[in-house]
């Protein structure tokens, strides 16, 4: 047996070290999905990161070439499955741009309200999950309590809790149900105080602060060079938000602040998302105040399903309209378009090439999580194994959106 004294080295003499390869994932709670990182370690120091993605690849972009434009909406639900209304909206806007149409004003307000609910839902999860990754579990339990309220609201309006498929080309699937606005007003009254509860849980937690402040710093220049977007970009001091700078739908009618931080570290990214939830509440409240009466989808029989579903049972014209759109879809003029929105994770874009048929010739998704994930490999001051968990959580990738 080797004596303990034999393992000791004279002062100043270097120890012999051995590089170790460590698999982080693909089944690991802190990777937030099926991400595999092969880490080359020297002790606890990470010398190299080799990412392995694709475990959740379903061929979404190729599948879209075999689907009509209406049938593609369920595929978009499964990109960032935490925030499907935002995915639906981005795709609908791209197709509407090709068609040269706009959704009715009431439908635009409903879409924006749903997109902001989705933003809160997505931010809530990482608001609680990042502290949990670092050992503080209570915040996640609080966050899931409020997220359950949002799931109930989504179920009330769409009939589904996750894969909502609520948007349609030219509007939304159905109008707001009776009793929905009082429910969402109740949520808007409760939620700001709940956000303050999250901050009280975390802002004096010395362990969480030491694990996130000054860790994973991304400068403004690096954030731009890496192509980051969303809270990950704004936390580095870049004042850019598509909702304000390239407004779509009715965002130019709404008043809100773009949240930025200067530190660019893990804590700044967490704070950005917390503050953005407050702004989303402001936007939802303005939507409820300004929303006019009127149609919830365009009145174009060749594009939109019959508004009155009862007519399908007693009108031959409505039945034919419903059957044709369900079975064959609608032709979209030949051309190409790129449409982008400010999704919860960042800039979500759809590039579509149409050949004039009811199905896209090519569809490309610009997924923000795919771009944001690359920042993990560009961070220079977070090279310890424990820091990888904090940085990855603060970037908030969704692997379904990365792998598509």
UniProtKB/Swiss-Prot annotation:
Keyword hit for Ion transport: no
Molecular function (Gene Ontology), one example: quinone binding
Location relative to the cell: Cell inner membrane
Record GO cellular component, one term: plasma membrane
Name of one Pfam family that matches: Complex1_49kDa
UniProt xrefs under InterPro entries: NADH_Q_OxRdtase_suD (IPR001135), NDH1_su_D/H (IPR022885), NiFe-Hase_large (IPR029014)
Annotated S-S bridges: none
Gene3D superfamilies, sorted: Cytochrome-c3 Hydrogenase, chain B
Enzyme Commission no: 7.1.1.-
Keywords per UniProt: Cell inner membrane, Cell membrane, Membrane, NAD, Plasmid, Quinone, Translocase, Transport, Ubiquinone
Catalytic activity: a quinone + NADH + 5 H(+)(in) = a quinol + NAD(+) + 4 H(+)(out)
Membrane topology per record: Peripheral membrane protein
Main location as per UniProt: membrane
HAMAP family in UniProt: NDH1_NuoD
Subunit structure as annotated in this protein's UniProt entry: NDH-1 is composed of 14 different subunits. Subunits NuoB, C, D, E, F, and G constitute the peripheral sector of the complex.
Family to which the UniProt record says this protein belongs: Belongs to the complex I 49 kDa subunit family.
UniProt function note: NDH-1 shuttles electrons from NADH, via FMN and iron-sulfur (Fe-S) centers, to quinones in the respiratory chain. The immediate electron acceptor for the enzyme in this species is believed to be ubiquinone. Couples the redox reaction to proton translocation (for every two electrons transferred, four hydrogen ions are translocated across the cytoplasmic membrane), and thus conserves the redox energy in a proton gradient.
Protein name: NADH-quinone oxidoreductase subunit D 2
Originating organism: Sinorhizobium medicae (strain WSM419)
Lineage, opening ranks: Bacteria, Pseudomonadati, Pseudomonadota, Alphaproteobacteria, Hyphomicrobiales
């Amino acid at each position: 047996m080797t004596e303990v004294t034999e393992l000791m080295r004279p002062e100043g003499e270097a120890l012999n070290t051995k590089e170790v390869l460590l698999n982080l994932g693909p089944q690991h709670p802190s990777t937030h999905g099926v991400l595999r990182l092969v880490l080359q370690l020297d002790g606890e120091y990470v010398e190299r990161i080799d990412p392995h993605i694709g475990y959740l690849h379903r061929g979404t972009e190729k599948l879209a070439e075999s689907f009509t434009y209406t049938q593609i909406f369920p595929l978009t639900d499964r990109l960032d499955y935490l925030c499907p209304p935002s995915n639906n909206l981005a795709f609908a806007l791209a197709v509407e741009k090709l068609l040269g149409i706009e959704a009715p004003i009431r439908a635009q307000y409903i879409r924006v309200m749903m997109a902001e609910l989705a933003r809160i839902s997505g931010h809530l999860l990482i608001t609680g999950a990042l502290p949990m990754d670092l050992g503080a579990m209570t915040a996640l339990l609080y966050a899931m309590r409020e997220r359950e309220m949002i799931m109930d609201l989504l179920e009330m309006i769409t009939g589904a809790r996750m894969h909502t498929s609520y948007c349609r080309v030219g509007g939304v699937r159905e109008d707001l149900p009776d009793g929905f606005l009082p429910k969402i007003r109740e949520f808007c009254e409760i939620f700001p105080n709940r956000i303050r509860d999250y901050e009280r849980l975390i802002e004096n937690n010395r362990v969480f602060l030491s694990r996130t402040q000054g860790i994973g710093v991304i400068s403004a220049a690096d954030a731009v060079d890496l192509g980051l977007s969303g809270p990950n970009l704004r936390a580095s001091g870049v004042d850019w938000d598509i909702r304000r700078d390239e407004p779509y739908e009715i965002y130019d009618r709404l008043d809100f602040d773009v949240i930025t931080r200067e530190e660019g570290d893990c804590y700044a990214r967490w704070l950005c998302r917390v503050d953005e939830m407050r702004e989303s509440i402001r936007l939802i409240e303005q939507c409820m105040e300004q929303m006019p009466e009127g149609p919830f989808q365009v009145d174009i029989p060749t594009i939109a399903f019959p508004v009155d579903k009862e007519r399908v049972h007693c009108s031959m014209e409505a039945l034919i309209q419903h059957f044709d759109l369900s079975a064959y879809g609608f032709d979209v003029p030949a051309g190409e378009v790129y449409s982008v929105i400010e999704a919860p994770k960042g800039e979500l874009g759809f590039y579509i090439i149409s050949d004039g048929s009811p199905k896209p010739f090519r569809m490309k998704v610009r997924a923000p999580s795919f771009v944001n994930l690359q920042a993990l490999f560009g961070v220079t001051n977070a090279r310890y194994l424990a820091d990888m968990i904090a940085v990855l959580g603060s970037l908030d990738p969704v692997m379904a959106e990365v792998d598509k």
